[in-house]
Amino acid sequence: LQQGDMTDHNIDKEWAVAASTLNMMDDKVPYAFVMGNHDLGKNSNKRDSQLFNNYFPYAKYSKMKNFGGAFEEGKMDNVWYTFKAAGIKWLILCLEFGPRNNVLDWAGEVVKKHPHHKVIINTHAYMYSDDTRMGEGDRWLPQKYGLGKDTGENAVNNGEQMWDKLVSKYPNILFVFSGHVLNGGVGTLVSTGEQGNKVYQMLANFQDGVKGTNRGQTGFLRIVDIDVKKKQVKVDTYSPYLKEYKTDAKNRFSFEGVDLK
């Protein structure tokens, strides 16, 4: 799962690198991705996803066996997938940077139609680096970008608003993964939804600008290991580029007693 900012300036040569990299996993490793603010128009002043959709075309990904559907047919901006692993049916929702109200409404309908799937939400901006959801007063809020001026059904949502309007409402939403935020670039939060279910929310961002990175050239990623019998989720942070793990408590941890039924 990739959380966006595949490019820095939303230009062809950067998209070509991003596409060629992810394409190496075709027919080998299933993958899903979202757009970050850097992947949109200049300074995210509008939802310009033309280059994103040129390099990651709907015609290709909609033919994959796990593809479920899209908010807008013909565009990869907001899509969902299903798969089965360890006897569990999973649904992945890939949501745009600062999901609009109408996108959250659509996502809720998708979740409602799949009550027996465990849901993973993959999005660019949701958690903050202080182990809370992004909300009023935080830096890098979607509302602070050009597209944040939209209103009505196109109004954007930060992490706290996403929790209120979508994440907290459905008992089968289990994980939310996000990036975007700098500072330390990591954050973890376990919250209880409206129906008593636990939701495990994580920020993991290793791009340029995060403390401890070297212009982003560290190649770190998260490995999430789910043990159904033990009801345990273990999280490791590893760089195949550096061949090393991050072993501090913010990058190596586990959740116990996870409801995986």
Where are these regions (language model features)?
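N-terminal active-site segment of His-dependent metallophosphoesterases
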Residues: 1-14, 139-142, 261
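Active-site glycine-centered loops adjacent to acidic/histidine catalytic or metal-binding residues
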Residues: 4-5, 36-37, 124, 179-180
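The substrate-binding groove and active-site-proximal loops of carbohydrate-active enzymes
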Residues: 4-11, 93-98, 146-155
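Extended active-site neighborhood of metal-dependent phosphoesterases/phosphodiesterases
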Residues: 12-105, 112-113, 144, 186-207, ...
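Hydrophobic/aromatic residues located in beta-strands of well-ordered beta-sheets
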Residues: 31-33, 119, 176, 201, ...
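Short acidic, glycine-rich surface-loop motifs adjacent to enzyme active sites
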Residues: 114-138
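Conserved beta-sheet core of the metallophosphoesterase superfamily
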Residues: 146, 151-228
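A short C-terminal boundary segment appended to hydrolase-like catalytic domains
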Residues: 214-261
